A protein has these predicted regions:
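Extracytoplasmic/periplasmic cell wall- or extracellular glycan-interacting regions that localize
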Residues: 1-48, 108-116
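Short beta-alpha junctions and helix-cap segments that line functional grooves
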Residues: 20-21, 68-69, 85, 96
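Short, acidic/hydrophobic/Gly-rich beta-strand patch recurrent on exposed beta strands
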Residues: 23-26, 53-58, 98-101
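Short alpha-helix capping/helix-loop boundary micro-motifs
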Residues: 26-27, 66, 71-74
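Periplasm/extracytoplasmic soluble domains of Gram-negative envelope assemblies
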Residues: 29-31, 60-61, 94
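Residue-level "contact hotspot" at macromolecular interaction interfaces
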Residues: 32-35, 73, 79
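Zn2+-dependent peptidoglycan hydrolase active-site motif and core
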Residues: 35-70
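Conserved, short, structured surface segments that act as functional micro-motifs
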Residues: 76-116
Length: 116
């Protein structure tokens, strides 16, 4: 969904002492974020402590959640193709995109899917 190194792995212990349900990717400042797979946007906007997030339903019980965006360039109900631009990261040297992949609402390790 964005270029950059993974700086926090799935299952890695967070600062709060819990296992991460997704991965964090360090991106360049103002990097473009794209849809990881084909799907339909089911949520796009600010959410609790996550800032701007996008949730995409991919079918067959899979969905992805992307958080940490500065701006969102898609809307609820929009159908997306893999690689289609959906948002932009903040203007910051420390920009990090948080990505979760879920199957039947359970988090799964997204790294193997993104390597395909």
């Amino acid at each position: 969904p964005a270029r950059g190194p993974i700086v926090a792995a799935y299952g890695q212990e967070t600062a709060k002492g819990v296992s991460a349900k997704g991965i964090s990717i360090k991106t360049r400042s103002e990097a473009q974020v794209v849809s990881p797979f084909d799907g339909t946007v089911i949520f796009a906007g600010p959410f609790r402590g996550y800032g701007n997030i996008i949730i995409i339903e991919h079918g067959e019980h899979y969905m992805s959640l992307l958080a940490g965006l500065n701006s969102i360039d898609c809307e609820v109900g929009q159908m997306l193709l893999a690689g289609e631009p959906i948002g932009q990261m903040p203007k910051s040297a420390e920009a990090k995109l948080y990505v979760e992949l879920r199957e039947d609402s359970r988090p799964i390790d997204p790294e193997a899917w993104f390597a395909k």
